[in-house]
Amino acid sequence: MTLKKVDANPSTLESSLQELKSDETSRSKINFILFLADNDPTTGQSWCPDCVRAEPVIYKTLEEFPEEVKLIRAYAGDRPTWRTPAHPWRVDSRFKLTGVPTLVRWDGDSVKGRLEDHQAHLPHLILPLLAPST
């Protein structure tokens, strides 16, 4: 039906999450965070081959869902930034990221499901994340 995308980075993700929380319509919608690597300015493509493979599959799967889906695309930074052990999303207890891409079903203030880098490109694993939360 409709896939609404919002872009964020380590300094803007919290405000994007607060907007989701305060938006009355978002509370009844399906919300995701897709943690990605930044695009390489010299090529225009992500420096992460798994992200390049997963992004189109994720977008297509979410766009085909009959209900509105909101997706925050959270860009982790360039390769050296992401590789830093103290990266904010690696140490944040809500996310505990170990790789990109990571697709997270976000409900309220918490993770309700996730697919790690080696799973995020598989539609048959994305679809169960779209099921109603309990």
Curated annotation (Swiss-Prot):
GO terms for molecular function: protein-disulfide reductase [NAD(P)H] activity. Disulfide bonds join C48-C51. Pfam families: TXD17-like_Trx. Residues 1-134 form the Thioredoxin domain. Keywords: Disulfide bond, Electron transport, Redox-active center, Transport. The keyword Translocase does not apply. InterPro entries: Thioredoxin-like_sf (IPR036249), TXNDC17-like (IPR045108), TXNDC17_dom (IPR010357). The keyword Electron transport applies. The active site is at C48 (nucleophile), C51 (nucleophile). One of its GO terms (cellular component) is plastid. PANTHER family: 42-9-9 PROTEIN-RELATED (PTHR12452), THIOREDOXIN DOMAIN-CONTAINING PROTEIN 17 (PTHR12452:SF0). Belongs to the thioredoxin family. Probable thiol-disulfide oxidoreductase that may participate in various redox reactions. This is Thioredoxin-like protein Clot. The lineage of its organism: Eukaryota, Viridiplantae, Streptophyta, Embryophyta, Tracheophyta.
